[in-house]
UniProtKB/Swiss-Prot annotation:
InterPro entries: Poxvirus_C7/F8A
Superkingdom of source: Viruses
Transmembrane segments: none
Biological process terms in GO annotation: viral process
Organism: Myxoma virus (strain Lausanne) (MYXV)
Family label: Belongs to the poxviridae C7 protein family.
Protein name: Probable host range protein 2-3
Length: 203
């Protein structure tokens, strides 16, 4: 991995009012994460991803891609500032799902991305694997982040991007994505995490 390059990436789940902070790697020109979504009801989930590239060490930032249960989903870039690139994507889930965000597909990167569990029913959130990051979860979105990233301009830019851009044949429109259950090994990992948390509570 490229040493000396340090990006910053935060992920906000707007409808859940959750902040997943510093999901970027310790170093290296790559960023992404895996988010297991647990839900018993159909719902829309809105993600805003704020990337602060290390402009001192790179010329161009890699775009962020997404897969939802293996299906490619377009992630519109809705705003740029001198320091940040802001992406927004809205998905519709009917049951448990796995969302993967990534700038690279090489396993040398993706294997060290962090992994999270977001239970939208119980409103509980866990870090399943921090990977090579200093990531943490805030069970709220701070007022400062709301003022910076949850603006009308970003909302309007997202609406415009969904209306104007032609559908990419290589990526799935969110309304046509059929969701499936988590892979068995992921379910076991999540179950183990839940049992550990229950034991901690009993202790």
């Amino acid at each position: 991995m490229e040493e000396g390059i340090v990006h910053k990436l935060d992920v906000f789940l707007i409808d859940e009012n959750v902040s997943i902070k510093h999901v970027n790697l310790f170093d290296g020109d790559s960023y992404g994460c895996n988010i297991h979504l647990k839900t018993a009801t159909c719902k829309y989930i809105t993600f805003i991803l704020v990337l602060e590239p290390d402009w001192e060490n790179i010329v161009e930032a890699k775009p962020i891609h997404m897969r939802l249960n293996g299906k490619k989903i377009r992630v519109p870039l809705v705003a740029k500032t001198h320091t940040s690139l802001i992406y927004k994507v809205v998905i519709y889930v009917e049951e448990d799902a796995l969302a993967r965000f990534y700038s690279d597909v090489e396993r040398s990167y993706t294997d060290v991305y962090p992994t999270f569990l977001v239970n939208t029913d119980t409103r509980r959130y866990y870090i399943l694997d921090s990977g090579r990051t200093y990531t943490y979860i805030d069970p709220f979105i701070s007022d400062g982040d709301k003022r910076r990233w949850l603006t009308r301009e970003i909302e309007e830019a997202y609406d415009a991007s969904t209306e104007e851009e032609e559908e990419d044949d290589t990526e799935e429109d969110m309304d046509t994505v059929h969701l499936y259950c988590l892979e068995e090994e992921d379910e076991e990992k999540i179950a183990d995490t839940g049992n550990d948390n229950q034991k901690d509570a009993e202790d």
